Amino acid sequence: MPASRLVRQVSAPRNLFGRLVAQGGFYTAGLQLGSGAVVLPVICAHQGLTWAAGLLYPAFCIGAILGNSLSPLILQRAGQLRHLLMAAISATAAALVVCNAAVPWTGVGVAAVFLATTGAGGVVTGVSSVAYTDMISSMLPAVRRGELLLTQGAAGSVLATGVTLVIVPMLAHGNEMARYHDLLWLGAAGLVCSGIAALFVGPMRSVSVTTATRMPLREIYWMGFAIARSQPWFRRYMTTYLLFVPISLGTTFFSLRAAQSNGSLHVLVILSSIGLVVGSMLWRQINRLFGVRGLLLGSALLNAAAALLCMVAESCGQWVHAWAYGTAFLLATVAAQTVVAASISWISVLAPERYRATLICVGSTLAAVEATVLGVALGGIAQKHATIWPVVVVLTLAVIAAVASLRAPTRIGVTADTSPQAATLQAYRPATPNPIHSDERSTPPDHLSVRRGQLRHVWDSRRPAPPLNRPSCRRAARRPAPGKPAAALPQPRHPAVGVREGAPLDAGQRIA
């Protein structure tokens, strides 16, 4: 074993997985209790601000676009101290939830505050998604990353369920709005605990070349799109990820669909927590058996089942009951849980370390742009309770996503070397003309010439090999000693020639 790897393994925390679970569990619980996708839309609907409820998720997506754009620059400054960055992110999210709980919930002013804090929360989430994905990709092997995300979701859901069922009834002694205030305050407390737990995670063992080299934001996106154009696996990944954005919006859609029912908020919060617990156990087994393809296909089918249940319940006049909208919301929650975990498992294995943060940033930005447009559309049509065609739209999008999931890779296998760079796919190996190796050292001009280098390599590989008896080569050749095999010229040779530098030539081959 190399000494560098031995030092890294010795310096890594022994219970790193448990510390990451604790940090992510508190973060998940805090976001559930102060969720801008479930809690704030229901509060706006109860206050009669239906227009604000439909604009909350688009505001979040706009902030996420800005956060994704700023994330490479922030990661460059953070370096290996990602645990401090995650602590700052948790503290900022807690401050935003406190603002939502402290502002008076009267008039149009509360809608403006909710929209502003939701947009700022999108910025925080955009930075957090890229930073956390890159951090766990460096700290954990490929087979543990999806398990970590599902375990964090389960731990956070259990905590949020216990708080909602036990602590909130003990604290709330007023009307329904008093309970909503308590939910937000407890959500802020969970985010503070997440920030404290992040301090014990420790710094990263290594940082990728892309994040260590400071580059302008324009060049970062130019490099990301150049790689996307030249790498078929990333185009396939990005197309599938964009088609699954409506699945991620399922929780917001069905929460707005059930917002008119009295007492629906606590039911939705509890069911979202239960859904994450059930989904954690379900998706972990599916991930081990069927890989990313099974995760995405199961997610699309569950979302389609939720839409079908909603259509049947509304047609029969049963949607106002808790069992109807609660079951549909539970299915949508389980379906949306695995979209992020599947995308992280997909891209963290295939993306080289030097390009990982850039590709995650580009993919998250495109997904946020689509979520902004779809969020406005779905948030508006979800509140049309008198018609059933909005649910038909959701069902159609789920069927399209299910078909697209068949192109995803299956099980992910890891070789004897469990480092992130050694992770490989068993059933899906992309064949590219000029694959990008993770051990290369690049400069900003190389990033800008990825596409040109790919085309030059393909062109040179199809050209016939140059003749070996060129005058320039004959003058530079050395005659071998009698009885010894000839050696190739020490000058670098193109891989298309078929002879490696310094490799012995065949006995019947002429000397150049």
Curated annotation (Swiss-Prot):
It is found in: Cell membrane. The chain crosses the membrane at residues 25-45, 55-75, 96-116, 123-143, 148-168, 183-203, 238-258, 263-283, 294-314, 329-349, 359-379, 386-406. InterPro entries: MFS_trans_sf. Signal peptide: none annotated. GO terms for cellular component: plasma membrane. Keywords: Cell membrane, Membrane, Transmembrane, Transmembrane helix. Residues 428-512 are annotated as: Disordered. It is a multi-pass membrane protein. This is Uncharacterized protein Mb2232.
